[in-house]
């Protein structure tokens, strides 16, 4: 079920504003992207059950000393994923079989070198909960079909296309390990290619995210993932436009307190992205001067 017109109109309006504001501010946008990498790395790895905290992830990426309890594997997982993110953000790469394999090799180097940059081979099966992914013999053809569908579909709305490809990719699970992290990087590759900023899929919303795959595998229902991608795009645009405007950014809780209004109502609106709120390190924030009456209701 495609994203509805009101959401499309909000994204269109936000993108137009973003495009106008970003002119001549490449250095600020780069700062935002770089500051966001630890949070993005933390969330994507946490979805895959990494035990690293956000603070530990930040220390690893800054080459600072971390607790002896942190495994070498998790150190490489953080560093490698950050490297993949930097590569994705370095240019408008076309999504292809070759690029997907390259990203996977970068992700698993020094972790699982024997499978890095390789699709599952004969006899290599994967199970996600009760779902068993297609046999290795079907990977090349199925991925090729998904890539062709994505590149040739000129009718579907862009967030719907990205959601469908993500569902197809994760349902296929072409790798022995690293499928989720690569899949989420592909989302950002696709967004950057068409001029949108990168997004973060949040670990705290993991259950809802996983429910999107179940809905697709059980009933070919794409609605949940379409909603997740669209709201993530709006949140990313809200964050960047706030910084590009030079706004004084405060916590949403403080904003609600300042105007003596109910915080739960604002949090609900933030989650729906009907107010220009965004998260940093898991905390909802907003422009202090935001005053669009009614949008928080």
Task: Locate predicted features.
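FIC/Doc superfamily catalytic core
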Residues: 1-177, 181-297
